[in-house]
């Protein structure tokens, strides 16, 4: 899986932080924005990780090798065209130039075969080019509503598809976001960005861009198409081949081009949260481009991305680190002061597992401080269950480090202790699952608990025990899947905790489908 998983946790934190800092200029697709009407009404809700006043037969594990639609594949060798990208006269050589030529050649060949099977019409190649933009390039980039596109324009958007001239431009500058992604995660990330922009070219040809849809809807489909192409690359079906690391890098890239936390994703230019974008990418990767074509009429569900109140906005959706349960009816509890009782009430009362015993969270500084003769694995990652004591031991130094990282936060810890509670639920249910299968069920069950704290139209799902006070903040689910990436197995064949792709997929199954999706 991604190279960031193959290094130490602190190196992962540093890498994700570095990428996040450079991701402020999230790619906005010019033509998509220009051809879409604004939508002011939204069903998204304002959320808070703080407590709110008292006033949902097969395991979810999915092998990330895409298998749903292998019929749409090119078996003939793909010719890599030397002019597939308009590099211009003064382009500095990049290590990934040949890879991108192969990517664009492969995308053209793939859509030449795939588009007619989905839409019943022949594929029309781009009327314009795929342009590399860089500071040294002469002023020869076509405009999108203007006579010319400047390099400063491209830097703002990172990459875009323009329907007016039917062309794509990407930032090839040495100091741009794409160069940073390639340096940190590999050139596959730029290939996925170009596959996303090709997705908008598909929408231009299929008439989707004429429907005045919310931007987030068309972005979701483009993410899905990018995932479908990445699945093709992972199957080694074309001119580009992806490794586990490349696929994992794609997941991280989707996280890094999410909407800012607190932004209504239905606002003009909205692309969706990291959880939304990763989910669309995975849907395409696993199920293929036909699945993506249906997302316009039947979009994937979106998680809310707006703050609940000014206080939540001020703390950026992060509850204070600590264990104090606060005062009844007053929103002053610390993180574990409301997460622990919420987990116990969910499993013991709302789910009502027979024989459930509430768990206690005990913070310790090192594993030697855990007085348990049957401590389960997980302490190194942050939390581990002691079944004989009905106790979850929290690795407080690791937990505090995660909490303080800019790209993680409070719900990284909610996810980690949620896994321990999910394991206790499997024990109480008498589950006989083992190994990776069992761990992925824990991911799914944790997602099912998370589903119960996501408001729908500003109301938490019912029925629920009235003493439960947890509710997610925008960005919380992104923090959870970031954490899944750093604790997951390095490759798909390790089969211990599940690869990052598998863990995120299982977690998402629980969030979307509830406990019934987990097969526990």
Functional labels for PLM-detected ranges:
Residues 115-116, 217-219, 223-260, 337, ...:
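Short helix/loop segments within enzyme catalytic domains
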Residues 22-25:
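C-terminal motif of bacterial Sec signal peptides marking the signal peptidase cleavage site
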Residues 73-75, 260-350, 489-520:
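Pan-zinc metallopeptidase signature
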Residues 34-68:
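Extracellular mucin-like PTS domains
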Residues 197-213, 230-234, 420-436, 449-455:
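Catalytic Zn2+-binding segment of zinc metalloproteases
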Residues 174-192, 210-214, 396-415, 430-437:
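Short pre-active-site segment immediately N-terminal to the catalytic Zn-binding motif
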Residues 135-169, 365-393:
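Catalytic zinc-binding patch centered on the HExxH motif and its immediate surroundings
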Residues 27-30:
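Bacterial signal peptide processing site
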